[in-house]
């Protein structure tokens, strides 16, 4: 128990000192408690003090993880806390009998709109401003609006003007029907103020304050001062609650050199109810990454698709939208957002991405420390080089090299090689591995370049021994650690060890090795496909052969060298074509075979 609390306490030390909300999770990933804080780190540290209440002690015994969402102000944290508690109803939060929430200002959707306080949202085209945490401030500002702007207060039409008309607080729309333009101007002024444009009104209040002080009417001066403060308070722009009935996901991608942090803010009925963070180590450009992520994320089996997906980068979305809607039977839209509110949401996403990135890097460092112990290394595996071999039935055999630094992909260290030591059709992974390890580390030694701290081979004991024999031949087996990872059982093999190491699924150290292995596998297969595609494309240059037939030639006959060994009759028979076309294929293959080169990197 104490150990898990110590781990949580260390995690809390890394949290930001800004305002925001925090969520405490149980072992089964259930939210136990949601809180807010002006200073997240300081607030959460209090949970680990000796002198805490019995209820808090019971809570902390069940907490296994804490997540934070940063906000732009304490005010926004308060609103977000309210929204999250209503959405998730955690066991350790207060359960209210009603669900009344914070008050808002409503401007009704009518010819002559009314302006009043409400706690209920009605989807009838009305405009809502807020919510406002301090109801007293809201009342003062509404009182100021009612006295300053001549909007209607009475509910029914009348033949005679109302009391407010005689007090100069109403245009008289209760008995006249020809004041639409004038009334519209009054309402627009109110909108202007509620959107935060209050400088002119503040100046007017300041002048009135000076006047009443001159008359020594200090009671009025105090009221005006309080009204001024209230006006400033409620004019603060907040972005946590947007009044609409759509469910909307905002997706922001925070790119760094070797890692992408993908932040998703999920809004439901205009309220932020969930934050989802994903980490991506792929080498996609930002536009490709957004498209790929949205496709994979929203087409997954249990993912609920919102009414709208907002992104902060312009990309082509027509095909993605169509695919999601067809697969999930939805009617979502993907839109590029650059509104004022969207920009503020993006700013909040950036803040949360940076916090998540810091936590991720800390976890990576712990995973590397763990890997160092497991592999019995003398130093941290800061640089890992991973190798894999790919071929097509022994043809176009290639090797890939990927580099990871501090557990993350380092694209400048990626290489691909054509294997020279194998004949076409020869399948020998051990020989291919020996060649690539020899070429790579002979070059590093000759050029006096730094060796990696760890080499990872995609394969089992045989592939490992082949690579290790080359390291011994180069006399660097004591300068670099080498291991292999067998995909089928995810077993780690080390030289001179008879038994492999099996780590639990999800182990952070194993995850690093899997990432390196999978990336080297992807790179090798990608290069192999490229070479095969080039052959296919070249075949399609023959007159009378299209893409489909070119692909069939590759599948049926193999490489240029294979075709070179066949005569026209054999080609015609295998491909079921006439002799004339077979001669064209034979001639083209002979020409290409002469041009074919076997080396990309020496």
Curated annotation (Swiss-Prot):
Compartment(s): Cytoplasm
Disulfide bonds: none
SMART domains: GIYc
Keyword annotations from UniProtKB, A to Z: Cytoplasm, DNA damage, DNA excision, DNA repair, Excision nuclease, SOS response
NCBIfam families, per the entry: PRK14670.1, uvrC
Subunit field text: Interacts with UvrB in an incision complex.
Record protein name field: UvrABC system protein C
Designated gene of the protein: uvrC
């Amino acid at each position: 128990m104490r150990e898990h609390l110590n781990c949580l306490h260390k995690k809390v030390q890394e949290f930001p000192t800004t305002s925001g909300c925090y969520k405490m999770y149980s072992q089964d990933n259930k939210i136990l408690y949601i809180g807010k804080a002006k200073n997240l780190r300081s607030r959460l540290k209090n949970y680990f003090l000796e002198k805490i209440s019995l209820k808090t002690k019971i809570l902390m015994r069940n907490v296994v993880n804490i997540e934070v969402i940063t906000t732009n102000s304490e005010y926004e944290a308060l609103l977000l806390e309210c929204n999250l508690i209503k959405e998730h109803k955690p066991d350790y939060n207060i359960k209210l009998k009603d669900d009344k929430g914070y008050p808002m200002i409503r401007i009704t959707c009518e010819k002559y709109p009314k302006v009043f306080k409400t706690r209920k949202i009605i989807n009838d085209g009305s405009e809502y401003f807020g919510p406002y945490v301090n109801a007293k401030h809201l009342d003062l500002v509404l009182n100021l609006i009612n006295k300053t702007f001549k909007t209607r207060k009475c509910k029914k039409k009348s033949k005679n003007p109302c009391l407010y008309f005689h007090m100069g607080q109403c245009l008289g729309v209760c008995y006249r029907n020809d004041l639409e333009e004038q009334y519209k101007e009054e309402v627009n002024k109110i909108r202007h103020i509620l959107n935060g444009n209050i400088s002119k009104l503040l100046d007017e209040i300041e002048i009135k304050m000076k006047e009443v002080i001159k008359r020594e009417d200090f009671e009025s001066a105090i009221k005006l001062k309080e009204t001024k403060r209230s006006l400033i308070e409620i004019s603060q722009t907040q972005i946590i609650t947007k009044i609409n009935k759509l469910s909307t996901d905002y997706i922001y991608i925070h790119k760094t050199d070797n890692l992408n942090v993908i932040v998703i803010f999920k809004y439901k009925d205009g309220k932020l109810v969930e934050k989802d963070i994903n980490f991506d180590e792929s080498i996609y450009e930002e536009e490709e990454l957004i498209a790929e992520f949205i496709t994979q994320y929203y087409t997954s089996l249990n993912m609920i698709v919102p009414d709208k997906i907002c992104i902060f980068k312009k990309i082509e979305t027509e095909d993605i939208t169509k695919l999601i809607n067809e697969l999930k039977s939805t009617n979502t839209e993907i839109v590029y957002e650059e509104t004022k509110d969207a920009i503020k949401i993006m700013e909040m996403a950036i803040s949360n991405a940076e916090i998540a990135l810091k936590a991720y890097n800390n976890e990576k460092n712990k995973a590397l420390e763990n890997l160092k112990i497991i592999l019995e290394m003398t130093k941290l595996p800061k640089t890992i080089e991973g190798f894999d071999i790919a071929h097509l039935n022994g043809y176009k055999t290639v090797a890939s090299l990927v580099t990871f630094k501090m557990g993350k992909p380092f694209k400048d260290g990626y290489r691909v090689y054509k294997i020279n030591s194998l004949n076409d059709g020869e399948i020998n992974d051990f020989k291919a591995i020996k060649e690539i390890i020899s070429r790579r580390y002979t070059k590093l030694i000759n050029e006096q370049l730094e060796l990696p701290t760890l080499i990872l081979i995609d394969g089992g004991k045989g592939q490992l021994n082949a690579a290790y024999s080359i390291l011994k031949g180069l006399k660097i087996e004591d300068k670099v650690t080498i291991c292999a990872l067998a995909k089928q059982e995810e077993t780690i093999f080390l030289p001179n060890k008879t038994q492999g190491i099996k780590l639990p699924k999800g182990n952070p150290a194993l995850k690093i090795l899997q990432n390196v292995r999978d990336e080297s596998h992807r790179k090798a297969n990608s290069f192999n496909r490229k070479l095969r595609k080039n052959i296919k494309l070249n075949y399609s240059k023959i007159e009378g052969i299209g893409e489909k037939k070119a692909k069939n030639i590759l599948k049926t006959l193999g490489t240029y060298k294979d075709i070179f060994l066949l005569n026209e009759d054999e080609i015609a028979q295998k491909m079921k074509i006439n002799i004339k076309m077979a001669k064209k294929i034979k001639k083209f293959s002979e020409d290409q075979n002469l041009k074919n080169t076997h080396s990309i990197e020496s």
